[in-house]
Amino acid sequence: MKQTLNIAVAALAVCLAGPASLLRAADVPAEGSTAPEFKLQSQEGKTVDLKDFRGQWVVLYFYPKDMTQGCTIEAHNFQRDLAQYQAKKAAILGVSADTTDSHQQFCTKESLTFKLLADPDKNVINAYGSLSPRGPVAARNTFLIDPKGVIRKVYVGVKPDPHSAEVLAALAELEK
């Protein structure tokens, strides 16, 4: 009885606090910290190393699952705005626990031309404090990394539709 009550109280606390509270802020790298390094495979099966992007901005966004509604909206918006990012010398890198084959299918189906990176072991997802508490998938978090490899902006639990515009606005502000 006592255990059931404790579980019910914990569930109620999570519901009242909202989904963003499920992520432990201490696990998410802080603004001003050096971005954790990584090497992951892209949808083309090529190794992508974060170090290769030194000298340019990086929008590193984590998302739950290829070919799902929210993830498709978010990816479409990044694709729509890609020329604006490129004009600001910013690369977009999407990361999920999906396979490279799944990423390739997603890119083909949705005409995505930026890199999607496969992290099936979730090592990078965990390094960025972006493992969803709702299952073995990434949480919808984004890190804006400057040309020196420093995290300048962190977004936790983003809404897919307005997110690309938010990141572009932050990038413009940080470039001043």
Regions found by a protein language model. Give the residues of each.
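Structural microenvironment flanking redox-active thiols in thiol-disulfide oxidoreductases
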Residues: 67-112, 121-124
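Short active-site neighborhood of thiol/selenol oxidoreductases, capturing the structured segment around
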Residues: 51-72
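A short beta-strand-turn-helix
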Residues: 29-32, 38-57
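Structural micro-motif
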Residues: 112-114, 132-143
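Thiol-/selenol-based redox modules, centered on thioredoxin-like
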Residues: 138-176
